[in-house]
Amino acid sequence: MQRNFTAITGARAGKSAENEALLSQQRAILRARLAHSKDGSITCSVENCVLILENDPVLMGVIRKDLFTGCMVIVGDMPWHRAGSCFTDDDFAFIELLFENHYSITSEKKILTALRIVANSNSYHPVREYLNHLDWDRTPRVRFALHHFLGAEICDLNEELLRLFMLGAVTRIFQPGCKFDMMLCLTGGQGAGKSSFFRFLAGNDEWFSDDLRKLDDENVYRRIMGHWIIEMSEMMATDNAKNVEEIKSFLSRQKDTYKVPYGKFPADRPRQCVFAGTSNKLDFLPHDRSGNRRFLPIRIDPGKAEVHILADQQASRAYFNQMWAEIMVIVPANTRYNSLRKHPSN
């Protein structure tokens, strides 16, 4: 028995008979545009499925690919219950029902192929959009942020280390896989808000992760996807040379190659993230004759902080937004970042 999907879609377009009639009219026009077989039935082809996804009044414009997470997403309201933006099995089930009811297409394989094509053609990058829409108020904050929230010394070195880290993070977003093998490390002051500093710096809590427990975990690369700033707190607590060498090797990689679950082919996935470290110990790095240039340590002193980062989270997040806006002003030239990368200190 055919379900009355038009009545369901009324939840998106309005439940009035007028809107339902408009939906039917729009779909009739679309059906006429599709390729038909000799017997007059709609051809079950990928091309037809793409046309439907791009022009159906419920589906047009909502299927996209998030270039940051690599996932297919649905943006906007849909006529069925959803929790989040990621494309789910339930979404596919309802789309299959729509194709069957209104276009007599029942090929799961062709619908899925068309979904991938349309999503790829309608891709976007949420972090790039976030950064590109920031407007700096011309008040310097990068120089003072570490002191303001964590009590670190206000000095040229600390400013340059934070600026370098932020420039590396921005470059990884706009040029995925670029060379950036440095880790900003905040040391000292248990409970001072070091992890919160990196979480707020990520701009969005979903873009931050502290869930990277083991570097040899087979799922480590999937834990990286969709995160911009990744904190290695527990690993930094083990101050032995073997552990540090493992971290240095991991930091030096510019891409990860793996196959997603149910995927047919492995793919190169250039890194879009940077890594941060936190430690309550000041001497968290063992002696290394080859140098520890990849680690950029900054000592904090919470007793000298002007505010606790969690005291007013809205104000803190606004502060970090303006820090990124400040960084974005110098990104086009990017000369300081390139200079520091060419002449790293050990």
Where does each model-flagged region fall?
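Arginine residue identity/basic-tract feature
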Residues: 3, 12, 27, 31-33, ...
